[in-house]
Amino acid sequence: MAKVYYEKDVTVNVLKEKKVAIIGYGSQGHAHAQNLRDNGFDVVVGLRKGKSWDKAKEDGFSVYTVAEAAKQADVVMILLPDELQPEVYEAEIAPNLQAGNSLVFAHGFNVHFDQVKPPANVDVFLVAPKGPGHLVRRTFSEGGAVPALFAVYQDATGVATEKALSYADGIGATRAGVLETTFKEETETDLFGEQAVLCGGVTALVKAGFETLVDAGYQPELAYFECLHELKLIVDLMYEGGLENMRYSVSDTAQWGDFVSGPRVVTEDTKKAMGAVLAEIQDGTFARGWIAEHKAGRPNFHATNEKENEHEIEVVGRKLREMMPFVQPRVKAGVK
């Protein structure tokens, strides 16, 4: 079982007298910066010129280029997209790191897969809230918190663990609990969850269910409601109280169908396929493929995205959602 740390375990905040540079001001960046500031930390924001720069200024932060922010900071938290981090790190952060500094991440991908190679004289750790930035900020403002993970990759100063817990405490995570892990475990489980269940697995299951009904002659609108729209109702019940809560809340007919039909859809062969996905994450096959795809300009990424967006379930869904003004996406969908 994971070891969990709480507020009572952070007896001395070793970062309170340090300057923290938040690199990036998106979903996580704005939450980390504001929570740390509210907890008395000295925070600056490092960005390239653009909308995020203006937003951070409006929110009252001193904003600098990434290089300028890194140069003056004791702690550098990189909250940029995975694929952008190596280039920004090499060009703007690495030349400005000093011995004893802390290099911090919210995901271990680039360190674990050797895309970012920190010098031996800095501490390297991650603090990863298990929720989106807006939730990290809102719960903090309400006196609560989102749980987080932390891991130490490199302890150059002898107090990297204390620094990691101090940072987690600064964003409020110790109110809920901070689980200790490793860069390897955080990275591999995160990627597996995305690919086999949360994104890849769910979208494949939803499309397969939709196509099965439509191919059998049922109206696509009904197939959409049954296989995609109502998924939120079930996921919310699971989110609130696990599988037990979901099964308690649905009809007995639905629960019995769960018991007798679920294992026929997700079979032992499915688990073997999941094992193959995990193996490709563990041996670096997935990471190498994604890095190569990004460096090539993402031709397959964009082509697949365009094709998927025109699947019948998407065409039908767009029309049906016009009937439901209460269903609004948090962000406008489009090509990244």
Curated annotation (Swiss-Prot):
GO biological process: isoleucine biosynthetic process; L-valine biosynthetic process
SUPFAM superfamilies (alphabetical): 6-phosphogluconate dehydrogenase C-terminal domain-like, NAD(P)-binding Rossmann-fold domains
TM segment ranges: none
E.C. designation(s): 1.1.1.86
Protein name: Ketol-acid reductoisomerase (NADP(+)) 1
Source taxonomy: Bacteria, Bacillati, Bacillota, Bacilli, Bacillales
List of catalytic residues: 107
Protein source organism: Bacillus cereus (strain ZK / E33L)
Job description of the protein: Involved in the biosynthesis of branched-chain amino acids (BCAA). Catalyzes an alkyl-migration followed by a ketol-acid reduction of (S)-2-acetolactate (S2AL) to yield (R)-2,3-dihydroxy-isovalerate. In the isomerase reaction, S2AL is rearranged via a Mg-dependent methyl migration to produce 3-hydroxy-3-methyl-2-ketobutyrate (HMKB). In the reductase reaction, this 2-ketoacid undergoes a metal-dependent reduction by NADPH to yield (R)-2,3-dihydroxy-isovalerate.
InterPro entries referenced in this protein's UniProt entry, alphabetically: 6-PGluconate_DH-like_C_sf, KARI, KARI_C, KARI_N, KARI_prok, NAD(P)-bd_dom_sf
Binding-site positions, NADP(+): 25-28, 48, 52, 82-85, 133
Domain KARI N-terminal Rossmann: start-end pairs: 2-181
Needed cofactors: Mg(2+)
Family matches, as NCBIfam families: ilvC (TIGR00465), PRK05479.1 (NF004017), PRK13403.1 (NF009940)
Gene Ontology molecular function terms on file: ketol-acid reductoisomerase activity; magnesium ion binding; NADP binding
Cellular component terms per the entry's GO annotation: cytosol
Biological pathway: Amino-acid biosynthesis; L-isoleucine biosynthesis; L-isoleucine from 2-oxobutanoate: step 2/4; Amino-acid biosynthesis; L-valine biosynthesis; L-valine from pyruvate: step 2/4
The UniProt record lists the keyword Iron: no
Positions of the KARI C-terminal knotted domain: 182-327
